[in-house]
Every structure is written in C-alpha cells, then in structure tokens.
C-alpha cells in the first residue's frame, strides 16, 4: 500500500487526506497544533457567490464529504449580506470534532502536535520529513498544506505584531515551509503599497459580550449591519486584508457581523476602546485573535510554485494545496485544491495518470489563473473580486446543481475522485 504524508491539517490537508485514503493509500496527517482545520476553526463562511458553484462541482467530482459536514453544521443558510448572496455560516465551535471523527472512521492516522521542521531529499525526490523532536517519517508521496500565515517574525515585520490567533505559534511553534526546506523558492504576496503579505480579514467577538439586541439579530438573521460614526471609518483597512471579496465600502462604513458561533466581525482588526464606543458593543471582547484590537495574522508569506496537477515545480513527489498552492482565499478554495492534490498524490504513488481539471469548471479556471505584472497583489476566490466576475463572464457561475452536474458529466468526470 502506498504511503502518503500530508503536512498541515487545515481544510486543504484534510481534503487531501480524504481523497488519498479513498484511493486506497495509507495516509498520515501531521499537524503542528492540537486542532485540525487551522483557520477553519474561526472562519465559517461557505457557499457565498461563486463558492456555491465550486461546492457543487466538488460534490459532483466525488468530494462531497466535507461539504456534507459544513452544510449539516450550518447555523444559517441561504443568507444574503452586503455583496454576497446565498451564503451559509457553519458553527466553528462544532466543525473540528466532526471532521476528526470522519478521518478516524476512514482510518487516516492523525498526528497532532507534530511540527515538521525539515526534509530529506535524494535529488528531486523527498525521501522523508523530520519532526521537531527528530523523528523521521518516510513516505512515497508528500503533500504540503502548511498554509502561508506567519510565523511570528513575519507578523512582527509585516503586520502589527503577533495577534495571538488560532494558529498559536508561541505555543506550538512557527510554520515551516517544506518547499523552502527542500531548496525551492516561495513567493510572497504584496499589498498595493508594496508591503508583503495581507492581514486575515476578520476577527471574532464573544457573542455574549454583545448587547441582547445584537445577539437576537444574529440568532434570527445570521448577520447584522451596524453603521459607524464617520470618525471611526477607516477605508485603508480594506486594501490590507486578504479577503478582497469583503473589501467593499459597506465593510468600511459599517460593522458587519456574521453568526458563526462567534460574532465574526468583518474587519482585520478594530481598536477595542473605539469598538466599545459603538452602541451594542459596550462590553465587546475578542475571542480570535485575542489581540484583535491591535492586529491580525499576516498571510500569503509562503506560496509555492506548482503545475496544473498541484505538483511542486522542482520536486517529483511533493504536491501542494490550499494557500500553499496559490493566492487563494477561503475554505472552499482550500478544499478544492486539497482534493485534487490528494487524488493526484494517490495516482502518483500508484503510477497512474494524474488529473488536471478543465477550465470548463470553475475550479479548473481558478487553478489556471495566470499571474500578471501585478500578480503578487491579486487574490483569487470564487466569492468575489476579479475572479468571481470572470466566472460570470465565462458562464461558470452555475446556481443549479443539475447544471453543475451537466458540466462535470460533459468532461466525463462524474465521481472521478472515487474511481
């Protein structure tokens, strides 16, 4: 049985693990913290705008397991909020245990608190990876889904310092780039002002610290829009955030809250003293990042170069997924890239032809997005911005599951991930 090791247990790594395991591989997920899903533990937004199409494409391709979980655990469905339609918000406090149960049911080995810090190579082949305590882990194929956030030095250098986010680098150690340890060069995104990286685009408030009126609004509608006084409006934050699909004027002129179990405040950070001056926020307290009044994690600091099969350029048995594989924003994007990486990892290990998704599908078009001169300042997401507009122009924004299945069937790819 082929052995596949996945480094990083976020949404992309989990998606890769499920796909590789269902192709018969022996799969191990090495995650540096004590939780799977990483930023998925504080995200929660699914199926908004073009992400609906991408979710249905994944389901038609055979990668529906994780969407079944997020759909089942959604606190609100079919929600329209500023700039976004038909969104679902999953319960970020319940999703990780459910995903962990799925992996155990499938027989996937989960290695928590296992930070991979080095690699061993023979030419262009990775022969093993080394954990922080010196253990050597061998495999036929490796998949890197370590993300692109931090570590602390980058958040200090290119942000406002460590914000004490869900990744908890001070406790579990910094992210290590496997591609760089293997001798490859990574890319870093740039903001319009030339500063590297981009802030995570939201912070989470304990719902109980909000007024009863706001809590009831969130429980009923799933979101709330609270106008800001002019003196508290800061439009500069919009260009600093990773989530350009939420870099719209309403997100600067208002506090927009989304109910994901926490109250998700759609701003990278917000001075706590100023926040408490807004009606309904007099007792507000941040849950993630703990220093959300000062800053947020800095992302897109370590993106690898890959081909259309998700294979790292320069290494023959390493594949990439999630933010490690491109300037992609969101859980759906992570699941999409990870699913293909996991499937192709199993194909590679078995000596079978790998799959490149066609551009007749939104996922295939996303993976084929080409860099321009300003490519390092661009973000790609099904949910908004430039790429969502491209989806609509190309007729890839399909809102009926039967239309999505028809497009997948036309490429003879129905349930391909399970064949």
Where are these regions (language model features)?
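N-terminal Rossmann-like FAD-binding beta1-loop-alpha1 element of flavoenzymes
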Residues: 3-28
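C-terminal auxiliary extensions adjacent to catalytic cores
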Residues: 377-419
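Conserved N-terminal/central alpha/beta ligand/cofactor-binding core
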Residues: 25-26, 30-118, 151-154, 159-201, ...
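A conserved FAD-binding loop/helix module that cradles the flavin
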Residues: 326-346
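Predominantly flavin-linked oxidoreductase catalytic cores and closely associated redox partners
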Residues: 110-250, 262-270, 274
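Active-site-proximal substrate-binding core of FAD-dependent oxidoreductases
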Residues: 346-381
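Residue-level detector of alpha-helix initiation sites
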Residues: 10-11, 35, 324-325
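FAD-binding beta-loop-beta segment adjacent to the flavin cofactor pocket
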Residues: 242-249, 294-328, 371-382
């Amino acid at each position: 049985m082929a052995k596949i090791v996945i480094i990083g247990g976020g949404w992309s790594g989990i998606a890769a693990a499920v796909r590789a395991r269902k192709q018969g591989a022996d799969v191990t997920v090495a995650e540096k913290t004590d939780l799977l899903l990483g930023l998925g533990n504080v995200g929660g937004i699914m199926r908004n705008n073009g992400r609906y199409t991408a979710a249905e494409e994944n389901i038609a391709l055979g990668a529906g397991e994780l969407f079944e979980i997020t759909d089942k655990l959604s606190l609100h469905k079919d929600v329209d909020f500023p700039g976004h339609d038909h969104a679902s918000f999953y319960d970020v406090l319940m999703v990780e245990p459910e995903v962990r149960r799925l992996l155990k049911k499938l027989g996937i080995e989960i290695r928590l608190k296992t930070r991979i810090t080095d690699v061993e190579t023979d030419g262009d082949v990775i022969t093993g990876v080394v954990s922080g305590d010196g253990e050597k882990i061998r495999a036929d194929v490796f998949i890197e889904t370590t993300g692109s956030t931090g570590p602390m030095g980058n958040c200090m250098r290119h942000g406002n310092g460590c914000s004490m986010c869900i990744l908890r680098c001070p406790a579990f150690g910094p992210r290590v780039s496997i591609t760089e340890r293997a001798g490859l060069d990574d890319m870093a995104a740039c903001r319009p002002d030339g500063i590297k990286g981009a802030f995570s685009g939201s912070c989470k408030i304990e719902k109980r610290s909000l007024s009863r009126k706001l809590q009831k609004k969130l429980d009923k509608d799933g979101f709330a829009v609270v106008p800001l006084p002019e003196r508290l409006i800061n439009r500069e934050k919009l260009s600093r955030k990773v989530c350009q699909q939420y870099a719209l004027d309403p997100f600067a002129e208002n506090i927009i809250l989304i109910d994901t179990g926490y109250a998700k405040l759609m701003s990278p950070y917000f001075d706590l003293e100023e926040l408490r001056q807004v009606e309904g926020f007099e007792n507000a307290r941040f849950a993630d990042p703990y220093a959300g009044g000062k800053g947020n994690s800095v992302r897109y600091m370590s993106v690898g170069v890959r081909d259309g099969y998700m294979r790292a350029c320069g290494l023959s048995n390493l594949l990439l997924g999630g933010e490690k594989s491109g300037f992609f924003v969101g859980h759906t994007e992570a699941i999409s890239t990870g699913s293909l990486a996991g499937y192709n990892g199993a194909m590679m290990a078995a000596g079978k032809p790998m799959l490149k998704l066609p551009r007749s599908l939104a996922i295939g078009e996303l993976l084929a997005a080409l860099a321009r001169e300003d490519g390092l300042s661009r973000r790609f997401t099904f949910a908004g911005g430039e790429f969502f507009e491209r989806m609509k122009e190309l007729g890839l924004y399909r809102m009926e599951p039967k239309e999505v299945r028809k497009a997948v069937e036309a490429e003879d790819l129905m349930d391909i991930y399970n064949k």
